[in-house]
Amino acid sequence: MLSLQYPDVYRDETAVQDYHGHKICDPYAWLEDPDSEQTKAFVEAQNKITVPFLEQCPIRGLYKERMTELYDYPKYSCHFKKGKRYFYFYNTGLQNQRVLYVQDSLEGEARVFLDPNILSDDGTVALRGYAFSEDGEYFAYGLSASGSDWVTIKFMKVDGAKELPDVLERVKFSCMAWTHDGKGMFYNSYPQQDGKSDGTETSTNLHQKLYYHVLGTDQSEDILCAEFPDEPKWMGGAELSDDGRYVLLSIREGCDPVNRLWYCDLQQESSGIAGILKWVKLIDNFEGEYDYVTNEGTVFTFKTNRQSPNYRVINIDFRDPEESKWKVLVPEHEKDVLEWIACVRSNFLVLCYLHDVKNILQLHDLTTGALLKTFPLDVGSIVGYSGQKKDTEIFYQFTSFLSPGIIYHCDLTKEELEPRVFREVTVKGIDASDYQTVQIFYPSKDGTKIPMFIVHKKGIKLDGSHPAFLYGYGGFNISITPNYSVSRLIFVRHMGGILAVANIRGGGEYGETWHKGGILANKQNCFDDFQCAAEYLIKEGYTSPKRLTINGGSNGGLLVAACANQRPDLFGCVIAQVGVMDMLKFHKYTIGHAWTTDYGCSDSKQHFEWLVKYSPLHNVKLPEADDIQYPSMLLLTADHDDRVVPLHSLKFIATLQYIVGRSRKQSNPLLIHVDTKAGHGAGKPTAKVIEEVSDMFAFIARCLNVDWIP
């Protein structure tokens, strides 16, 4: 590999912070100011090295051309019914943003209802959340620009898709819940702050409030319905009960699956919604999660993990809400995790379980909880569902590593409940029958069995020669289920690659127990699980360290960076997207404080001692052995990422280049690409997605000497 000349970067050796008696040097703290001329110059100097490096990768053009060709397939969501009309999202293939269509009936002509593509020249304005009024006649929708979490809410009259003048600003992480009379909507916003709020700022997000907006009035007249002045981190999202009588307020403090649950009986608000609501504190602790399903009068059905880490379904009668009086409707499964529930056709419950990282879909009786039917499903994931209490039909969407998507429709008024294929998509150019998916269970360091999916061409020899791409996440109770990825299948097809996805601890694959096994004091388990996945792939002959790439984003960016520090000998290439790299300071920026539920916080001495051991920024060291260097590393971030602010990646790359990059033995590149008009990933336009994956796989090909197979 050619040796790269990294920029000379100023180190402020006087920037030292004391953590519980430990002096920690932070020489690149000046990179925390995104607006300083110095930071802008740093970003420009880094991009000046990285962009040509990526553009000179021999296969980049071939990869981008193939990606553009194969990604050009139709993408549909499930149909969903609102009032008397049906709606669905559709992307013809390469549109930057998907378009919302409306139909008067399932057989009727489809018309464009909302096309976000016309809101910007480059596709960087995206739809972020929407809500229809109960009768389906009004539509509220959130827009975000350049990938930021900040949202502007606008309104439309559905008939004729007529734009209304109402606009709501300073909205972020918000609910959108209409009262059933269609007069207005609950939403969340943050107080005004100094400086800008466009997604390039790093200021912390505290004191979120709940407001009610009356349609046709100015935002300045909105009614404050809930606030928590003594609890700045609390966030309270509202939803209306199915009968429209109750407002349910779900209060969260971080990212743990726990919430308080308060409610207000709107019939008790004699003057309507006119101020802080009369909240009844049904659950006033953070000891479990309560997810509203439906209610019959005062008997409310919830999905909960209270004393049931795999979740169960319970009934609570608001007239007699003592925990000892709760009734179990569907008990917790000993192994499978209940992911979500919906009530449909007034007396049915649809339950979706996760069984060894594969979905199961069931129909139960709302009154007795009894199982009525299990829907037939291949091995894969349910990625879409629609069907509410007043509907008599459901739609659900299935996908897997080798199937882009099948949408099923089931009419629940029929005697025999047989789902039919409503729509099936194929991708021309990738023949699924040439490939196979296997799921294996490998032992981690402490003996725990970890599931991993492996996708490869049929009939390959396990001789250690294949390039492999290992992906992981491992945090925040999020399960990584099979999904269809054209970019990764191109790697398998045209780069002779092996795709592996490791379902490490910290995720939700086996419920709250699995999540707790990879957070706080147990965070090292995530890194051990992932390193053992790599060792399994090598031992079984799928790949070898020099041919192995690891990849993750956000919490997964932290994962792959920590693994590179701990085992630089185990990987050939590391691609860390929008990663959390400074574990001592993450809680100070934007919404970082919410992640302390998974990571802890350096303000605590005990937590500091966990964090400083694995924080990527604080554990970069030149490997001692002469024949070991750091893998090739590419960090990806963006100027409008206000979820994981770019300073994490900027400080980490400066540290890598200084400590490792100056060494003679480090011939593998250590690079960063900072994108513009992009954020953490939600709403990213197709054109940017194609550029990003072309960069990633071109980097892999160049660094690991992978040839293109036509």
Swiss-Prot record:
GO terms for molecular function: metallocarboxypeptidase activity; oligopeptidase activity; serine-type endopeptidase activity; serine-type peptidase activity. The N-terminus is blocked. The modification N6-acetyllysine is found at K157. It catalyses: Hydrolysis of Pro-|-Xaa >> Ala-|-Xaa in oligopeptides. It comes from Homo sapiens (Human). Transmembrane segments: none annotated. The gene is PREP. It comes from the Eukaryota. This is Prolyl endopeptidase. The keyword Hydrolase applies. GO terms for cellular component: cytoplasm; cytosol; extracellular region; membrane; nucleus. It is an enzyme of class 3 (hydrolase).
